[in-house]
């Protein structure tokens, strides 16, 4: 048996996270992915000191081959080969088009208009390879009033309203941490769209251009607040860890430094189970907590009382106890916890790969397990030009 995309060649000229990670997902499915980087201006995530190049090996951005040391770059570019070309030079552009002749898919994530300036837009690529599939994923898409805007994940999160939803009621958006959720969703959106285009080409022989707006790919993930606004006129506000409809619904401190467990109770049956798990304290039998409406209307006191109980427990002990009686609960894990987690280890999620410049590490691995199709070998990110 072969991996699903064995025999498919992808050229990746995307920058930062969404596009490169989407191309890596195609590599996870068995495609041969070739990352084309400009020289002498390599990818943002390779440049020491760049805002996008974070998490250096041994916390040293200026070690051997500093352009290979960024954690961001290494995560988003696994399972790829690489080549450096100066696309502003006629020879570099000619070489790129020769490479495109052998490819099935081209991925770019420039701001709208940049591919045209470089001469690698879809019409030019179609002349080179008539059945090529080209995916463009500027932040706001290739058409519309914002088509030329330059964007990064934080700006797209702001445009989508995600910043306004996260955080606590007494904090403004300036206190909201950056998560770049748009980038993660953009990567999966890209991979899905390319798979659909490959299926179409297999049926018809036709390539096509895919216009992906990262913002539009993200907005459905905010479906409830958006639809609540159009259906009920309610403007969403940040609520911390709370929910519009159920309580308790929060994150509670446990024993130990920076130790937490999240708990959700969405029915009277789960509330009864939580009460019994806590030892049925006298306060839990008070009338104000008898029903969902009462619990939802008294969340400040309820959360404080629950936290008095969780403070005496290890976070995983609290999780196992509550899960054992049917109450949704999860210990809040940090990176150290994740790499030591027995469930992820048993499923073989983390994959070990060695890189000549930074050494051998465990990487978050393939997102899928197929019953019939094998997974291709897992490789660390390519070195510059390798």
Language-model features: where?
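N-terminal helix-loop segment corresponding to the beta1-alpha1 unit
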Residues: 1-203, 383
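Short Gly/Pro-enriched turn/cap motifs at secondary-structure boundaries
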Residues: 64-65, 73, 239-244, 251, ...
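Aromatic-enriched alpha-helical interface/lid elements that frame and gate functional surfaces
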Residues: 248-325, 329
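Conserved Rossmann-fold dehydrogenase catalytic segment
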Residues: 142, 171-180, 202-218, 237-244, ...
